[in-house]
Amino acid sequence: DDKRLLLDLLDASASLWNELNYERRQQFFDGESVWDTADYRKQYVDVLGSATAQQIIRKNKSAWQSFFAAHKNGEDTAPPGYWGNEDEGRELRTIIRNDQYTLETGERSRVEIPVGHALKDEYGLGYHDRLRLEVCGAPKWDGEQGRLEIQYDEIDDTFRAFQPVTVPDSRQ
């Protein structure tokens, strides 16, 4: 079931963010460097795929860099937070690198995203298969695609995708 597979992918993404963020928060509050962390990519590559794990790690690093920049400027800010928790529910989301997904729009719009081998095995996908999902709605802009962020809205029981694009100067 594609929905279950996507939910598992989003849950693993949130788990990666939370584990990495927990280690960085502990180091921060202990007065240590937040940049020396375990290699979480290796722990999650089988479920998320290498590029997706890398994107989540990069987004977490960027969140910490923003925190330190604001902190340095004297802003009253808190360290990056968690994407929910296992008991009360995680904020289910993931980030797909711009060269790792394809979006086709038209009469039957769809997006194809990579998943790790463990999820492929669990859900019966072939080695080269990707998760193919129907897309509703149409992009407001077209241009060079950025990374794709997918979030699950539990209240509406729907998935939302956010895709930044770079629009050429001549069309702005």
Summary of predicted features, one role per range:
Residues 1-172:
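Nucleic-acid substrate recognition interfaces
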